[in-house]
Amino acid sequence: MRLPREIGPIHFVGIGGIGMSGIAEVLCNLGYTVQGSDASDNANVARLREKGITVSVGHKAENVAGADVVVVSTAIKRDNPELMAARAQRIPVVRRAEMLAELMRLKSCVAIAGTHGKTTTTSMVAALLDAGGLDPTVINGGIINAYGTNARLGGGEWMVVEADESDGTFLKLPADVAIVTNVDPEHLDHFKTFEAVQDAFRAFVENVPFYGFAVMCIDHPVVQALVGKIEDRRIITYGVNPQADVRLVDLTPMGGGSSFKVVFRDRKSGATHEISDIVLPMPGRHNASNATAAIAVARELGLSDEAIRKAIGGFGGVKRRFTRTGEWNGVTVIDDYGHHPVEIAAVLKAARESSNGKVVAVVQPHRYTRLQSLFEEFCTCFNDADAVVVADVYPAGEAPIEGIDRDHFVLGLRAHGHRDVLPLPKAADLAGIVKDLAKPGDLVVCLGAGNITQWAYALPNELKALG
């Protein structure tokens, strides 16, 4: 039995979240009656309202009146008044991943998982399937610039989804094709141990049906070890690793992007195939690696070399992934979502490759627990930044942890050998600090998953106001 068409209003608690809003938008496009609530207005809420979805600001018990089902994310606590009202009225309550799984059952699905790179890789797979005329349905964890949204309903048989591992619910997703970009210690508040994280990714791959396949990056040692443990599913490996089935070669940085080749080697027949002259308009080896994963899927689904080149060459990127927000006096300001040490190091390396000037990093650490558990890694991931400006920790709902704060982080970076680290007293001081640090040709990279994105968009005009 599939999701019935005659189901009544579907109410989303926390509809403005990036994951929830995408599912709500696709359900609305399918003709279901969708409504929801969120703690505050945001761009996602505004976009959903434009589609005719009723969104209430604030959580109140009466918001769920008349709903046939209530969808909640893991961020919603048990004492939320709408969740409590739904349970009191015996309205079925489902988690975000369960509703996403229901949508996935309507199509053949590619699900993209990994500690980093999910959103960009999901967007690239979508762009490739679009270019191949497959018209996919897409539900992503970020705004795809080509769509202006994180979700779209396509007319084809394929769906492309970002599989969020943060709470373990990605194991509910019925993927026909799985991508695993990397596996690093993250979300230990849920998983408790890194071994549990690895076990979850193994189960994710083993959930793929016998007629499906998984695409896995063996440049990452944990993923390569995982490949060795999976016996009963078809695996396609990718990366710069000489042993990869789909190998990234001749990667050459060029301006704000890169060019490369991809070589395919069939383990059964020994046959090889090469796609050369691929140009990706995004900098960084990590983005070329993400593109290689997407290309591996595209070729398996029958796309031509020319369609692959065209899709990658025209890829418009994802909001908050190395997004240029403006310029001042020859200084370019970049906004990036990177908030884990591995992501930060990759973004700064890409910045270094795409600039002849200095790289100034502005970082807003995200969550006290993350800064505490990965402190050593945070103190060594800024080597490609000539200067680092450190803001206060963005709590994301967490209580402060004594001794884990901006100043402790500044001291840690200096102790680990960084030559130029400054604390940011308050957001209003950022423009003045950047004005003194940056010269024409430099890149200012704002990093974090909190409200630093607002600073990144305001900064060019604030610098202009200073003269």
Swiss-Prot record:
Its main location: cytoplasm. Pathway: Cell wall biogenesis; peptidoglycan biosynthesis. Pfam families: Mur_ligase, Mur_ligase_C, Mur_ligase_M. The keyword Nucleotide-binding applies. Keywords: ATP-binding, Cell cycle, Cell division, Cell shape, Cell wall biogenesis/degradation, Cytoplasm, Ligase, Nucleotide-binding, Peptidoglycan synthesis. ATP binds at G114, T115, H116, G117, K118, T119, T120. It is an enzyme of class 6 (ligase). It catalyses: UDP-N-acetyl-alpha-D-muramate + L-alanine + ATP = UDP-N-acetyl-alpha-D-muramoyl-L-alanine + ADP + phosphate + H(+). It is found in: Cytoplasm. Its EC number is 6.3.2.8. One of its GO terms (biological process) is cell wall organization. One of its GO terms (molecular function) is UDP-N-acetylmuramate-L-alanine ligase activity. One of its GO terms (cellular component) is cytoplasm. Cell wall formation. HAMAP family: MurC. Belongs to the MurCDEF family. This is UDP-N-acetylmuramate--L-alanine ligase. It comes from Bradyrhizobium sp. (strain ORS 278).
